[in-house]
Amino acid sequence: MNSESVLEEIVLELYRNKLFKIGEYRLTSGKISPYYIDLRILPSYYDIYSKIIDISLSKLEKLNFDIVVGIESAGIIHASFIACKTHKPVGYVRKKPKQHGTKRLVEGIVADRNVLVVDDVATTGGSLEHAVNAVRSMGGIVEKAFVFVDREEGARERLKRLGVELISLMNIWFIINVLVKHRLIDEQTYYLIKNYLNREKHS
């Protein structure tokens, strides 16, 4: 089975297990979206998660990085799995510095290291930009960031302006096209999501 076939099966499993949902959902950015990708509970589905991690590793195997850094909170567990599988150390970036103890924003030794920043889903790229800036402020080198899903709402362009390449396992168009192919969403839903994405792309 080639990688695209594996990804197609992953999309179908995400849909069957209600990790991809249709409806009105408020995102972290405050925007209302006609769909939601809930990858926070993904590790609870071992069969799906192991497939995603394995195919992610094949996508990352040629990259040069010294440490994997996840973004609080969803990105931490994914970064941990990737780090373990690639025999690399792991760290994470907090949303806000600790209010006690060391008061660190970045946990892990990143200075003078090539850092791979990891999160579950990229939307506008705000959380990724925060992580990149935090790691760089500690002397880390960030040239690549990785997510499972790119919602195609500006994150890639935002990171490019920072000199960071966003690598994604799949994007929302791939997911939607798979669901249409298998008749899991109707034409009205397809155009609702398409119009939303086109609007956000140019906002």
From Swiss-Prot:
Binding residue positions for orotate: 123, 151
Q: What is this protein called?
A: Orotate phosphoribosyltransferase
Enzyme Commission number: 2.4.2.10
Provide the binding site for 5-phospho-alpha-D-ribose 1-diphosphate: 94-95, 98, 100, 119-127
Under Pfam families, the record lists: Pribosyltran
| Keyword annotations | Glycosyltransferase, Magnesium, Pyrimidine biosynthesis, Transferase
Please, which domain of life does this record's source organism belong to? Archaea
- A GO term, aspect molecular function: magnesium ion binding
Kindly give the InterPro entries that the UniProt entry links to this protein: OPRT, Or_phspho_trans_dom, PRibTrfase_dom, PRTase-like
| Chemical reaction(s) catalysed | orotidine 5'-phosphate + diphosphate = orotate + 5-phospho-alpha-D-ribose 1-diphosphate
Family statement: Belongs to the purine/pyrimidine phosphoribosyltransferase family. PyrE subfamily.
